[in-house]
Amino acid sequence: MPKTNLSPAITYLAIPPSGQGPGVLVVHAWWGLNDFFRGLCDRLAGEGFVAAAPDLYEGRVATTPEEAKRLRGLPKREPTNQTLLRAIVELRANPAVVGPNIGVIGFSMGGHWALWLAQQPGLPLGATVTYYGARAGDYGNSQAPCLGHFAETDEWVSPASLKKLRKSLEAAGRVADFHTYPGTGHWFAETDRTDVYDSQAAELAWSRTVAFLRRQLRPPEL
């Protein structure tokens, strides 16, 4: 990990009422670190996790795809992958975090990055969750089981890309549990995307996510 003089990578941190818990890194979609993703960290804290979110857009947020495309292309103080790697180090070192490994949850663009992190050697990842984000590659270095939530109709994630992801995970012998939610589209789990939000599918995906994280991360004594 290269040393930098940058500010901390973690922008938003939510601690559970108990004051400690397994760590979970939340990687936002291309909208930026908006109220939904901050609220997601709070929900995770309410479930007993220490949830942390880096701001990959350095304070900027988008509400339309056009704005999001522009923000995604703007110059950054450091590459996104380095920000995420620093965030993992910071979260793992937080005294509120218990257990040897942390989890990562990513949405859309963030899901793509969560799967990139899952491919990197030597990271303390014990669980990977992707919401409608797919990324094929070499998962031979991954030790983290994967949970995926996907829309039935998705103009951003093709059936071919999802098939490639499945094959990549299978080739590496990784455990993967994928769910497709009928009648949904991309961003179906995000409450602020009112045109596509599906409350029933979102709550089912949430309950599966929490159960998965507890199973993979929670030490027996907690």
Predicted regions and their residues:
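N-terminal cap/leader regions of alpha/beta-hydrolase-fold enzymes
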Residues: 1-222
